[in-house]
């Protein structure tokens, strides 16, 4: 009975050939407990009402769908920005952090652990940990702490312990590894609050569901403002949580083009041990990373390549399995932009609209700039502005100074 049940459970997390659960046996009971707990949680009216309360009164939802008049004039198409930068904390990450923290409380957990790259997910986890009374620990690569010191301090200010990861490339990939090691040791009282649509089932599904509030709002707001759905929706993609959250409510609306923009870094080249980019969808290969089969950056021996991007939040060697499936099936179009193109878009939105975007979101804006000239986006485009750029000002200033 148990073997059959586990087998059926594993099949639930498949997206074509991607997804699944490639984890140590010791984690399987915890994953099944999480799957069962989530099924109960999402069908519990009181729990959903509590989530709605926190999304509205703590996170500040719904976020505006803003008509970018000056950007629209420049590119000759109606450009709307989904303002996830206005969510409490400055990014879309709080949508998922609130959902998972309330799920953890529902399941009787008392301790939260998380990984973070740019620090936005870590900050969101620190926020919910503080307001809901959890002991909270965030793992962050030492390289990312150096380029996102303000976010590391914000987490500590809210009572979270930030643990620097000194192994590997000292970035998001390594932070996930350390968080998983912690979880294996402390399964009974700990919930691992994964920040993206990555990892073993049921995490990609759970994170997607909690982030889908973005796409649901876009759908309603587009009808209110334009009387129809957008021709194109653009979102940046590292692990892919903001992209999947924006895209998922539109999957069946085939007339809407869905474009995931990856970090092209210094160009789509690889050295022996590292990629000079983070473009897993565009040129990655099938492999296993952090408990799921997906598209990853790897060498000829199957070893994970270190990724690179000016944006800490996109600096990841893989991508969520559902996004890999949607890209391969043709429903989502994968594109990339370079560091320099993203920095140009960062400056352009700041100057034209008075909105400073995160470097992650700047990748989506940079593709808007590239594609608008060809007319491929149509007359009505939505760009998900996944976060604000305050956290990136020091990075941008350092680059300008040549530091």
From Swiss-Prot:
The Swiss-Prot or TrEMBL record describes its family as follows: Belongs to the TrpB family.
Q: Which organism is it from?
A: Methanosarcina acetivorans (strain ATCC 35395 / DSM 2834 / JCM 12185 / C2A)
Which major enzyme category is it?
Answer: lyase
List the CDD domains. Answer: Trp-synth_B
Q: Which GO molecular function terms does the record list?
A: tryptophan synthase activity
What's the catalysed reaction?
(1S,2R)-1-C-(indol-3-yl)glycerol 3-phosphate + L-serine = D-glyceraldehyde 3-phosphate + L-tryptophan + H2O
Q: List the PROSITE patterns hit by this protein, alphabetically.
A: TRP_SYNTHASE_BETA
Which pathway is recorded for this entry?
Answer: Amino-acid biosynthesis; L-tryptophan biosynthesis; L-tryptophan from chorismate: step 5/5
Q: Which residues cross the membrane?
A: none
Name of the molecule in the record: Tryptophan synthase beta chain 1
Residues carrying N6-(pyridoxal phosphate)lysine: 93
Query: Which cofactors does the annotated protein need, by name?
Result: pyridoxal 5'-phosphate
Q: How does it assemble?
A: Tetramer of two alpha and two beta chains.
The EC number of this protein is 4.2.1.20
Mention any one GO cellular component term assigned to this protein in its UniProt record.
cytoplasm
User: What is the documented function of this protein?
Assistant: The beta subunit is responsible for the synthesis of L-tryptophan from indole and L-serine.
Task: Write down the Gene3D superfamilies for this protein, in alphabetical order.
Answer: 3.40.50.1100
């Amino acid at each position: 009975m148990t073997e059959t049940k586990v087998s059926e459970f594993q099949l639930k997390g498949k997206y074509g050939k991607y997804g699944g659960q490639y984890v140590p046996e010791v984690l399987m009971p915890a994953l099944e407990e999480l799957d069962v707990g989530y099924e109960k949680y999402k069908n519990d009216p009181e729990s959903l009402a509590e989530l709605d309360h926190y999304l509205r009164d703590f996170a500040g939802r719904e976020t505006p769908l803003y008509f970018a008049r000056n950007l629209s004039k420049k590119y000759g198409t109606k450009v709307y920005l989904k303002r996830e930068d206005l969510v409490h904390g400055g990014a879309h990450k709080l949508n998922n952090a609130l959902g998972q923290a309330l799920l953890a409380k529902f399941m009787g957990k008392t301790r939260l652990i998380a990984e973070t790259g740019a620090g936005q997910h870590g900050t969101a986890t620190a926020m919910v940990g503080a307001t809901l009374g959890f002991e909270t620990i965030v793992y962050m690569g030492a390289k990312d702490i150096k380029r996102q010191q303000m976010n590391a301090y914000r987490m500590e200010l809210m009572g979270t312990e930030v643990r620097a990861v000194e192994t590997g490339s000292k970035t998001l990939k390594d932070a996930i590894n350390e968080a998983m090691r912690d979880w294996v040791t402390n399964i009974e009282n700990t919930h691992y609050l994964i920040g993206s649509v990555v990892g073993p089932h049921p995490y990609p599904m759970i994170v997607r569901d909690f982030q889908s509030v973005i796409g649901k709002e876009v759908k309603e707001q587009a009808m209110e403002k334009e009387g129809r759905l957008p021709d194109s929706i653009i979102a940046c993609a590292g692990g892919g949580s903001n992209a999947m959250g924006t895209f998922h409510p539109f999957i069946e609306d085939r007339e809407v083009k869905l474009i995931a923009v990856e970090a092209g870094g210094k160009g789509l080249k690889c050295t022996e041990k590292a990629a000079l980019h983070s473009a897993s969808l565009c040129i990655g290969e099938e492999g296993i990373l952090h408990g799921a089969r997906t598209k990853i950056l790897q060498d000829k021996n199957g070893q994970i390549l270190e990724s690179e991007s000016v944006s800490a939040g996109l600096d990841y060697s893989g991508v969520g399995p559902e996004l890999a499936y949607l890209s391969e099936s043709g429903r989502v179009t994968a594109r990339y932009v370079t560091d320099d193109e993203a920095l140009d878009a960062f400056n352009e939105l700041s100057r034209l609209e008075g909105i400073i975007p995160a470097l992650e979101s700047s990748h989506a804006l940079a593709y808007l700039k590239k594609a608008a000239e060809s007319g491929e986006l149509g007359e009505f485009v939505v760009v998900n502005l996944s976060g604000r750029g305050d956290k990136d000002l020091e990075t941008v200033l350092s680059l300008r100074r040549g530091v």
